[in-house]
Regions:
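Juxtamembrane membrane-water interface segments that cap and precede transmembrane helices
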Residues: 3-13, 165-186, 198-202
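Aromatic- and kink-enriched transmembrane "portal" helix at the membrane-lumen/periplasm boundary
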Residues: 17, 54-72
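Transmembrane-helix motifs of polytopic, lipid-linked glycan transferases
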Residues: 25-42
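Transmembrane-helix signature of polytopic, membrane-embedded enzymes
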Residues: 39-58
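Membrane-interface transmembrane helices that cradle and orient dolichyl/undecaprenyl
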Residues: 81-96
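Membrane-interface alpha helices of multi-pass inner-membrane proteins
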Residues: 97-111, 228
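Perimembrane helix-loop-helix junctions
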Residues: 118-142
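Membrane-water interface signatures at transmembrane helix termini and the short loops
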Residues: 203-261
C-alpha cells in the first residue's frame, strides 16, 4: 500500500506537495494498521488479514483516495469509530465506546459531510448491544456534540468568526446519475461486481461465525449499504465516495477469500483481476 501511494505521488507531483504526500502516506498506512487490527481483534479471518489485502487492492483501483490527505484522514477517523463500535461485543464499557464513536464521527464529518451516516450506524450498534437501555441511544450524539464544542472552542480562539457547520449537512436530490469518466466507471463496475459476489457468498460468510461476530459483520454490511444509498442519491456526489463504499466491501469480501470450499484457483484469478485493474488505473 505504501508503494502504491508512493507511485501515485511520483506520477502526480504537480498535484501533491511534499508535506501533503508525507501526511497522506502516514494516514493511509495508519488506516492499513487499523484495518488489520480490527480484523484480527474481531477474528473475522482465521490466519490472514484478507480484508487488508482487499483494501490495498481497492485503493489501487480507486486512486482518488491518494489525491487528498484530508479524505484519507476522514477514512482514519471512520476506522477509529468502527474500532469502538465493533468492540462492543465484549459488553465492557458500552457507554464509553458509544460516546467515543460519536466523537470520532464528528472529526470524520469535518473531512467529508458524507460521514454523517455513521451516526445511524452508532444507533444500530446501540440496538444490537444495548437495546434495553434507552440512554445508550443518546451517547453517540453526545460524543458528536463534544467534538463539535471542542472544535468550535478551538476555532474561536484562533479565528474571529465561528465555522458554519450548516455547510456540513448532507444534500439529496434523489436523481441517480451514472455518467462518469472512464476511471470512475471502472470503479463503479468493480463495486457492482464485488457486490454481486458478496450477495452470492453471504450465507457462506455468516454461518461459520459466532453470534457477536455476525452482529459485527452486519454492522459492516449496514455501513456498506448506507454509503451506497447516499452515493446514489447525493446532490454533491464526488468520486471519493466510491472509496467509502470500498471500505465496507474490503471487510466483507475479505471473508470470501477464506472460504475453505472455494477453490484456490478462483481466489487467485479474482485477486489478479483486481490487481490488474489497479495497475490499469496508473
Amino acid at each position: 500500500l505504501g508503494l502504491s501511494y508512493g507511485m501515485y505521488a511520483v506520477f502526480h507531483l504537480s498535484e501533491l506537495t511534499f508535506l501533503n504526500s508525507f501526511l497522506g502516506g502516514i494516514a493511509i498506512l495508519s488506516c492499513a494498521f487499523l484495518i488489520d487490527f480490527i480484523v484480527k481483534k474481531n477474528k473475522f479471518q482465521d490466519q490472514h488479514s484478507y480484508s487488508l489485502l482487499m483494501f490495498c487492492v481497492l485503493c489501487n483501483v480507486n486512486q482518488m483516495i491518494f489525491k487528498s490527505p484530508i479524505e484519507i484522514l476522514g477514512l482514519l477517523f471512520i476506522l477509529l469509530a468502527l474500532r469502538r463500535l465493533l468492540s462492543l461485543k465484549s459488553q465492557i464499557d458500552v457507554s464509553k465506546k458509544l460516546f467515543d464513536a460519536g466523537f470520532w464521527v464528528f472529526w470524520a464529518v469535518l473531512c467529508n459531510p458524507t460521514h454523517w451516516l455513521l451516526l445511524l450506524l452508532i444507533l444500530v450498534a446501540a440496538v444490537f448491544y444495548a437495546g434495553h437501555h434507552f440512554k445508550y441511544f443518546l451517547l453517540g450524539f453526545l460524543g458528536f456534540a463534544c467534538g463539535l464544542i471542542l472544535h468550535l472552542a478551538t476555532a474561536l480562539v484562533f479565528e474571529d468568526t465561528a465555522p458554519n457547520y450548516l455547510n456540513l449537512l448532507p444534500n439529496f436530490d434523489f436523481k441517480i446519475d451514472l455518467r462518469h469518466d472512464l476511471p470512475q466507471l471502472i470503479n463503479l463496475y468493480v463495486l457492482i461486481v464485488l457486490g454481486i459476489v458478496l450477495v452470492i457468498f453471504m450465507s457462506s460468510i455468516y454461518i461459520p461465525l459466532k453470534l457477536n461476530q455476525q452482529r459485527n459483520l452486519s454492522l459492516l454490511l449496514i455501513l456498506l449499504i448506507l454509503y451506497t444509498i447516499y452515493s446514489l442519491f447525493s446532490a454533491n456526489f464526488r468520486p471519493i465516495n466510491f472509496m467509502f463504499i470500498s471500505l465496507g466491501l474490503a471487510f466483507l469480501t475479505g471473508n470470501i477469500l477464506q472460504i475453505k470450499g472455494l477453490k484456490l484457483i478462483y481466489k487467485e484469478l479474482f485477486l489478479w483481476l483486481m490487481i490488474g485493474l489497479g495497475i490499469f488505473q496508473f
